[in-house]
Amino acid sequence: MPLVREVTFNLLRRLGLTTVVGNPGSTEETFLKDFPADFTYVLALQETNVVAVADGLAQGLKKPVLVNVHTGAGIGNAMGALLTACLNKTPLIVTAGQQTRQMLLSEPFLTNFEPTQLPRPYV
């Protein structure tokens, strides 16, 4: 049976979403391990910059860019840039990492409690 990451990369590849911009933390390590050679990963420091870089790339490439920020705190940091991208009508696909299931039992600091609510209304 294929791994979730393999299925994910195959889907992204089929959709032409091979540019990823992010500020990885430990929760994203498995996503970045053995990162596919036909994908481009753009590393940016701090999530505001991550979304701003992705905004510019998506506009320049004239296609959606995948953005990965680091948990709920990362979404919070990115809100100003998300507002700008929303007003620019830039096609971004935003994901936020989450703590491992075992860690979620103790509600660690970086837990993303309401991941679909936090970035509203801009995502």
Please identify what each model-predicted range represents:
Residues M1-V123:
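N-terminal alpha/beta PP-like core and its mobile active-site loop of ThDP/TPP-dependent enzymes
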